[in-house]
Amino acid sequence: MGLSTLEQKLTAMISAPVEALGFELVGLEFIRARVSTLRIYIDSENGITVDDCADVSHQVSAVLDVEDPISVLYNLEISSPGLERPLFTTEHYQRFIGEEVSLVLRIAMQNRRKWLGIIKTVDGEMITVTVDGKDEVFALSNIQKANLVPHF
C-alpha cells in the first residue's frame, strides 16, 4: 500500500519507541481535515488494552513533540487493529492469505474502486484476490485502503 511521504517519515520516527514498549507497529494513517488525525495501530500477542494505548500515546507524543513533523493541528489516536484489521504491508497480505479483504483503490480498475474478495497470493508488490470466483491482480501501490472482513 502506498504510504505518503509524511506517513513514511512518521513510521520511521515512531517504530523504535513502539517496539521498545513490546508492541508491533501495525501501521498508521494521517487523515487530513480541519483538525487532522494521526491514527496509529499497535498489536501484541496478548492483545491491546487501554493502558497499552496510553503508554504508547505518551511515548509517541514525546517523540512527535521533539521532532515536530506535522505542521497542522491534529489529534493523536492509538488503537488496536480491531476486527476489521487494516492491511498496510506486503507481510500483512501474506499473513492473511485465505482471508476475505475489502479494498479501495486509488485508481479504478474495470470502472470500480471498491473490491471484496479472498486474498489468494502475494507476489512482490502484487496481490491476487479471488472476486466472485475470478482472480483479480492488484498493485499494492494502487491500494488506498485494505481491511479484513470479519465473519461471525
UniProtKB/Swiss-Prot annotation:
Annotated protein name in UniProt: Ribosome maturation factor RimP
CDD domains listed in its UniProt record: YlxS_C (cd01734)
Subcellular location, principal: cytoplasm
Protein family: Belongs to the RimP family.
SUPFAM superfamilies found in the cross-reference section: YhbC-like, C-terminal domain, YhbC-like, N-terminal domain
Gene coding for it: rimP
UniProt-listed Pfam families: DUF150_C (PF17384), RimP_N (PF02576)
Function comment: Required for maturation of 30S ribosomal subunits.
